[in-house]
Regions:
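Long, well-ordered, tryptophan-enriched scaffold segments
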Residues: 100-192, 196-198, 202-207
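Active-site nucleophile/metal-coordination loop of metallo-enzymes that catalyze phosphate/sulfate
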Residues: 1-132, 142, 146
Length: 210
């Protein structure tokens, strides 16, 4: 309800002669029914991180655009991490500005921080990346390198908080899509060998490269 469709969805339903649930709706229905939290692949990832003392990295587009991801899905994963008792978990947030208004990103990130706080979670946001860098799909590797270095090599600028980093970008007339990847000071978020990574984008084409 209230989610914009597109030609692909229309053609698929017309061709099938029936309603074909898209990934967004299928995940929403799994959350509503309670089956999402027991999803085997999700539980396996959480268990591996917990039992082996590895850092859990959650990455994806923090947005309510509904094209590549949906923010409520991330909130559900945060809740699942809390229930599993994973001690070391961070979020690498990609900002939208393409399927949403150009500067809605800070509001979405504040909503995420509020959810984390309300659930007494120890999860922290470790880095923020504009989708221009983190979600390239056309082999523009010089773009992807900015995100890769922030994720794996402590590259990019550091800011005291998510808000200060995003506002700095806005002050430079840089909208959400083009935010140069930055890290949050004091948050250990580097991806190391044998760490566990969950990408919560339900559309796969723009996260294959990273």
């Amino acid at each position: 309800s209230g989610q914009m469709g597109n030609s692909e969805v229309g053609h698929m339903n017309i061709g099938a002669g029936r309603v074909v649930f898209q990934d967004l709706l299928r995940i929403n229905k799994a959350i509503d029914s309670g089956t999402f939290k027991s999803e085997p692949i999700l539980q396996e990832a959480l268990e591996i991180a917990k039992q082996n003392g590895r850092r859990l990295h959650i990455m994806g587009l923090v947005s309510r655009g509904g094209v590549h991801s949906q923010q409520e899905h991330l909130h559900e994963i945060v809740d699942a991490v809390n229930r599993a008792g994973v001690p070391d978990a961070v979020i690498h947030a990609f900002t939208d500005g393409r399927d949403t208004s150009p500067k809605f990103g800070l509001g979405y990130l504040k909503d995420l921080e509020s959810h984390i706080s309300q659930t007494n979670s120890q999860i922290q946001i470790a880095s923020v990346h504009g989708r221009y860098y983190a979600m390239d799909r056309d082999e523009r590797w010089e773009r992807v390198a900015h995100s890769y270095n922030a994720l794996c090599s402590n590259g990019g600028d550091e800011f005291e908080s998510v808000e200060s980093g995003v506002i700095s970008s806005y002050d430079d007339h840089t909208s959400d899509e083009f935010i140069v990847p930055f890290r949050i000071k004091g948050v250990a978020g580097q991806i190391r060998p044998n760490d566990v990574v969950i990408c919560f984008n339900f559309r796969t084409d723009r996260c294959r490269q990273i």
